[in-house]
Amino acid sequence: MVTHSKFPAAGMSRPLDTSLRLKTFSSKSEYQLVVNTVRKLQESGFYWSTVTGGEANVLLSAEPAGTFLIRDSSDQRHFFTLSVKTESGTKNLRIQCEGGSFSLQSDPRSSQPVPRFDCVLKLVHHYMPPTPCAGPKQPGGALHPKRTYYIYSGGEKIPLVLSRPLSSSVSTLQHLCRKTVNGHLDSYEKMTQLPAPIKEFLDQYDAPL
């Protein structure tokens, strides 16, 4: 295992400036994956960085069920945690990083494969309900309902509902426009028709949330 301080700065993205810089990384590729993810999370507007589990509970206490945020994990074995308000209170779900991808912690008794993603934002978006302008559709334009996922906590089986992120900062107008465009680009063909500078700008944050 190697730590962030072992990696040279040359040719790499901006070093981590959150509590994650004290974490241990298994490889340079994992370090780069986390650096790229942090950069996108910092632009997302709902990354709360060093907020603790207790502080996340306070932040979400007055919010409706389905409100969520991303923060740094207090567990040294993990990088990020998804804190979400449920009907049973706030639940903290570890986001696991393994084999160059992220996944949400699952019930160890389950034999079902866990969805994996190369970015935390894509992971979060996967568990959110489909919007009218995106998502797979049935004939006639109706959206296919997404599969229901469950949280297993303290013996409870709770449906995982991610409705809206809790904002940690005000997004720029440019970023809001980028998210809107990302939500409407549902095919590679549409992306290739865009001018190169716009494609590059969208690639820097390729999520609709």
UniProtKB/Swiss-Prot annotation:
The keyword Phosphoprotein applies. Residues 46-142 form the SH2 domain. Residues 22-33 are annotated as: Kinase inhibitory region (KIR). Pathway: Protein modification; protein ubiquitination. Pfam families: SH2. GO terms for biological process: cytokine-mediated signaling pathway; intracellular signal transduction; negative regulation of receptor signaling pathway via JAK-STAT; protein ubiquitination. SMART domains: SH2, SOCS, SOCS_box. GO terms for molecular function: cytokine receptor binding. Keywords: Growth regulation, Phosphoprotein, SH2 domain, Signal transduction inhibitor, Ubl conjugation pathway. Gene3D superfamilies: SH2 domain, SOCS box. Phosphorylated on tyrosine residues after stimulation by the cytokines, IL-2, EPO or IGF1. It comes from the Eukaryota. CDD domains: SH2_SOCS3 (cd10384), SOCS_SOCS3 (cd03737). Residues 161-208 form the SOCS box domain. Residues 34-45 are annotated as: Extended SH2 subdomain (ESS). SUPFAM superfamilies: SH2 domain, SOCS box-like. SOCS family proteins form part of a classical negative feedback system that regulates cytokine signal transduction. SOCS3 is involved in negative regulation of cytokines that signal through the JAK/STAT pathway. Inhibits cytokine signal transduction by binding to tyrosine kinase receptors including IL6ST/gp130, LIF, erythropoietin, insulin, IL12, GCSF and leptin receptors. Binding to JAK2 inhibits its kinase activity and regulates IL6 signaling. Suppresses fetal liver erythropoiesis. Regulates onset and maintenance of allergic responses mediated by T-helper type 2 cells. The ESS and SH2 domains are required for JAK phosphotyrosine binding. Further interaction with the KIR domain is necessary for signal and kinase inhibition. The SOCS box domain mediates the interaction with the Elongin BC complex, an adapter module in different E3 ubiquitin ligase complexes. Interacts with multiple activated proteins of the tyrosine kinase signaling pathway including IGF1 receptor, insulin receptor and EPO receptor. Binding to JAK is mediated through the KIR and SH2 domains to a phosphorylated tyrosine residue within the JAK JH1 domain. Binds specific activated tyrosine residues of the leptin, EPO and gp130 receptors. This is Suppressor of cytokine signaling 3.
